[in-house]
UniProtKB/Swiss-Prot annotation:
UniProt lineage: Eukaryota, Viridiplantae, Streptophyta, Embryophyta, Tracheophyta
Keyword Lyase: no
The keyword Glycoprotein appears for this protein: yes
Propeptide regions on this chain: 28-130
MF terms in GO: growth factor activity
Assigned GO CC terms: extracellular region; nucleus
Signal peptide: 1-27
Listed InterPro entries: RGF
Protein name in the entry: Root meristem growth factor 10
Tissue specificity as recorded in UniProt: Expressed in root tips.
Modification after translation, per record: The tyrosine sulfation is critical for the function of the peptide.
Modified residues (Hydroxyproline): 140
Gene name linked to the record: RGF10
Residues listed as glycosylation sites in the UniProt record: 60
Length: 143
């Protein structure tokens, strides 16, 4: 009888641990990600247009004209672009091609501007060397 109780206790303990871990985990399952990957291309085009509208206004008029002229175009299977047939190759400006100004990136300290061929070693950030120092083998001396 005592052995049956201990076996039931351990079984319930294992079930409780497994259930508590599965309830504590907030990770997404792969099924949700697969559904998100099969998004309609029309929705992507609408989202891309909204993103270009939400970008910071540019002071240069040519940049705004270029960003508007390079809108994403939906290509059909038969070579039609927006209902017109064309034989020319159209390029779509991608987000990776855009230049990001350095003011948008936050930094904890000022990054020095050295020439890439000859970096100045005397002006390195002091935290870098301290992170990779070897441990000291001498005990502290108290007088």
């Amino acid at each position: 009888m005592d052995m049956l109780r201990s076996a039931c206790f351990y079984f319930l303990l294992i079930v409780f641990v497994i259930l508590s871990w599965s309830l504590l985990c907030d990770s997404r399952h792969l099924g949700h990600m697969e559904k998100k990957l099969s998004v309609n291309l029309d929705l992507l085009n609408k989202d891309n247009e909204e993103i270009t509208k939400l970008e910071a206004p540019s002071t240069n008029k040519t940049n705004t004209l270029l960003s508007q002229s390079h809108a994403v175009v939906n290509h059909g299977d038969n070579g039609q672009i927006n209902g017109k047939k064309t034989k020319e190759i159209h390029r779509v400006k991608r987000a990776s091609d855009k230049k990001v100004s350095s003011k948008r990136v936050s930094r904890t300290w000022k990054i020095p501007k050295y020439p890439k061929k000859q970096p100045k070693s005397d002006q390195e950030h002091p935290g870098f060397n301290l992170d990779y120092m070897q441990p000291t083998t001498h005990p502290p001396h108290h007088n």
